[in-house]
Amino acid sequence: MSSAKEIKKSILAPVLDNNPIALQVLGVCSALAVTTKLETAFVMTIAVMFVTALSNFFVSLIRNHIPNSVRIIVQMAIIASLVIVVDQVLKAYLYDISKQLSVFVGLIITNCIVMGRAEAFAMKSAPIPSFIDGLGNGLGYGFVLITVGFFRELLGSGKLFDMEVLPLVSNGGWYQPNGLMLLAPSAFFLIGFLIWAIRVFKPEQVEAKG
């Protein structure tokens, strides 16, 4: 992966062409849990990008020295170490957000996207392409999180990043917040609409009828 075109493709392809959530249906649980606010969705995106990119890099770096029988354990050990770093940094510098994200930072360890890229790509590729692949898949995951988080916070509370955007009835405005948007089912609906929109734009992603 030497050309700028290939690097660009590796980073941008997971956003629409091969999105981990919208096409592969991976990492959905955290997408439901951390998208009530745009702030938590953004921080979770950065966390997953960091873990996916660096775990890919380190797994690729030692891939030729990992016995096949313990490769999954080694991958999980690397991922877990990076997740612990992220968790400690959040607790030290963004404690309130860390509390809101709760156990879902720790559950990055079991995120199918992170494990999947380490096994499917990093074990077969050089370190730099693996790092870029991790960034791209983290970005694709974050694209869905941030999109869903944007609509859930805006429609659910009339705010973005805790700043009032839609004038609330309680403050003399016209917007009555939709409480449903703050509940997990709304994330299912929004992810469904997003998948539909992507497949309208990218009809080749529609499954062939049997």
UniProtKB/Swiss-Prot annotation:
Composed of six subunits; NqrA, NqrB, NqrC, NqrD, NqrE and NqrF. Its EC number is 7.2.1.1. It is a multi-pass membrane protein. It catalyses: a ubiquinone + n Na(+)(in) + NADH + H(+) = a ubiquinol + n Na(+)(out) + NAD(+). The chain crosses the membrane at residues 11-31, 42-62, 72-92, 103-123, 131-151, 178-198. It is found in: Cell inner membrane. The gene is nqrD. Keywords: Cell inner membrane, Cell membrane, Ion transport, Membrane, NAD, Sodium, Sodium transport, Translocase, Transmembrane, Transmembrane helix, Transport, Ubiquinone. The keyword NAD applies. NQR complex catalyzes the reduction of ubiquinone-1 to ubiquinol by two successive reactions, coupled with the transport of Na(+) ions from the cytoplasm to the periplasm. NqrA to NqrE are probably involved in the second step, the conversion of ubisemiquinone to ubiquinol. This is Na(+)-translocating NADH-quinone reductase subunit D. Belongs to the NqrDE/RnfAE family. It is an enzyme of class 7 (translocase). One of its GO terms (biological process) is sodium ion transport. GO terms for cellular component: plasma membrane. It comes from the Bacteria. The keyword NAD applies. GO terms for molecular function: oxidoreductase activity, acting on NAD(P)H, quinone or similar compound as acceptor. Its main location: membrane.
